[in-house]
């Protein structure tokens, strides 16, 4: 039996200027008229539903983008807004291997770690002119030539760096030691403890360390500033000076450096600075600029 559609006369439509309190649904509710349109398969006989199920529905149109007309290989891929800091081309990297002493230039995630270069000058024959990596304790290069002049010996490992922080270390005795880097070489094993000190109000800070012959170790800590009788603040006999240097810093033209001092033959050496005549150690944080030595 077919359903009967409601007659138009049975539906009350309010006039244009008349507020109606009744709705058409109340008038036609006795006819069991569906209020919502039923789904398509409700009106399809069972014999035809199987045939309709074999029909593949149309694919909805894809959202148009500015790159819709470009080939797939030319469409720019989505990337994060935060980009990695580009690694300096002259950054010297050492693989985290205890046996490898050869600098590696492989570009992997480990190489993105900021490096610390250390050059050491000492009267000890096994520690003369060594340049090591603080993160691994491996030797980057070694200067073997003898230096007779004590003035040159104090600054033999000075080098140019791009990083704005540079550390100059001079020996100072303390008793504590903390294992940070061990066994720099087999003849004179040492243990390192490195700590950085940054104070926004100071342009330089002092840090001290000491190698002991009984327990060969190097420890870094912050020393105490003191005044002499003439009112001048002096450094301890050995210390680390953290200099705040701009990216455009020109070490060769620095008035604080002694430009008359000859340049050494070390691979990472540059113009000598006017440092005290003590055993010295320079720690360069960041990538090293190619040497200007001749």
From Swiss-Prot:
Coiled-coil positions: none
Stretches with biased composition (Polar residues): 7-26, 66-81, 255-277
A cellular-component GO term for this protein: nucleus
Subcellular location: Nucleus
Segments of this protein annotated with the region Disordered: 1-30, 51-86, 250-294
Recorded superkingdom: Eukaryota
Broad class of the protein's primary localization: nucleus
Statement: the UniProt record of this protein carries the keyword Isomerase: no
UniProt keywords, alphabetically: Nucleus
Protein name: Uncharacterized protein PB1A10.05
Protein's organism: Schizosaccharomyces pombe (strain 972 / ATCC 24843) (Fission yeast)
């Amino acid at each position: 039996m077919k359903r009967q559609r409601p007659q138009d006369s049975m539906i009350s439509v309010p006039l244009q200027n008349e507020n109606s309190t009744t709705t058409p649904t109340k008038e036609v509710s006795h006819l069991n008229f569906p209020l919502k349109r039923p789904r398509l398969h409700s009106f399809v006989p069972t014999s035809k539903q199987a045939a309709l199920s074999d029909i593949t529905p149309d694919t909805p149109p894809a959202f148009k983008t500015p790159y819709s007309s470009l080939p797939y290989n030319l469409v720019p891929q989505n990337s994060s807004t935060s980009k990695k800091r580009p690694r300096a081309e002259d950054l010297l990297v050492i693989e985290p291997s205890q046996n490898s002493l050869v600098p590696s230039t492989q570009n992997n995630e480990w190489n993105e770690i900021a490096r610390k270069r250390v050059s050491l000058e000492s009267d000890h024959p096994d520690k003369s002119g060594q340049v090591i990596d603080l993160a691994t304790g491996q030797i980057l290069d070694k200067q073997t030539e003898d230096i007779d002049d004590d003035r040159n010996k104090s600054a033999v490992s000075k080098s140019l760096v791009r990083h704005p922080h540079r550390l100059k270390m001079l020996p100072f005795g303390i008793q504590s030691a903390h294992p940070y880097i061990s066994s720099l070489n087999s003849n004179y094993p040492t243990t390192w403890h490195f700590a950085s000190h940054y104070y926004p109000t100071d342009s330089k800070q002092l840090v001290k360390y000491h190698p002991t012959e009984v327990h060969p170790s190097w420890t870094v800590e912050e020393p105490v500033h003191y005044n002499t009788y003439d009112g001048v603040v002096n450094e301890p006999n050995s210390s680390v000076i953290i200099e705040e240097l701009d990216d455009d810093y020109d070490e060769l033209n620095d008035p604080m450096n002694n430009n008359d001092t000859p340049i050494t033959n070390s691979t990472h050496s540059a113009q000598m600075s006017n440092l005290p005549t003590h055993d010295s150690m320079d720690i360069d944080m960041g990538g090293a600029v190619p040497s200007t030595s001749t």
